[in-house]
Amino acid sequence: IKENFIFFISSTSAHFSINSALIILSLFVNDKELGRFTLAYKVAFILRMVPVFFIQSALQQASKSFTKSKEEYKVYTSKYFKFGLLISFVISSLSFVFSDLIIYILAHEKINYSSNILSLISFVPFLAMLNFKNITYILVNDLKFILNKATFYTLIFMFISSLILSYLYGGYGMALSLLLTELFSFFI
């Protein structure tokens, strides 16, 4: 029960750090700006799932290769990591370049603010992919305590940075906070 509770806390912390952005931003901006931010945020949120899919698809084989040989595990995860970085960079770059078109298709009108926000947060998937090796190692070795600790620290960082940056810069501050949170998650 204790192990499952630790995993539950970790999952809850990760959920809050991802989904609390709109709630926090709503404290500092009007409804119009929040709606325009949300339009871009939802696109980036879907793209943010790409690294999650990579981790899920690699986890079983990574576990098998880890039990066979540490060297085989390193080769496998490095290969998968490089491929994931390439794919997430291409996806991020395309969403950056075509942010105006993406927003136009979704909103049926040109919204510069949403396009600018999407341009900023389009690299969240790439930054999240940087954490592939760390997360895979933690999951393969069943290090739930470390995962819980890391997600909790990331949650605290996200709350503090998003409160400060959203207060100072509105949606642009939240976009910056989301990018910084992904970097912070990688470095801890």
Feature roles, as predicted:
Residues 1, 54-60, 129-137, 164, ...:
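C-terminal transmembrane helix end/exit motif
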Residues 1-18, 61-75:
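Interhelical loop/hinge segments that connect adjacent transmembrane helices in multipass membrane
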Residues 5-8, 21-22, 35-51, 82-83:
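Alpha-helical transmembrane segments of polytopic membrane transporters and translocases
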Residues 33, 154-187:
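Membrane-interface helix-loop junctions in multi-pass transport and translocation proteins
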Residues 44-70, 74-77, 135-140:
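Helix-loop junctions and terminal segments of transmembrane helices
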Residues 70-86, 93-98, 115-118:
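Interfacial transmembrane-helix starts/ends
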Residues 96-129, 172:
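Interfacial segments at transmembrane-helix termini and the short loops linking adjacent helices
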Residues 123-153:
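Membrane-interface junctions at transmembrane-helix termini in multi-pass inner-membrane proteins
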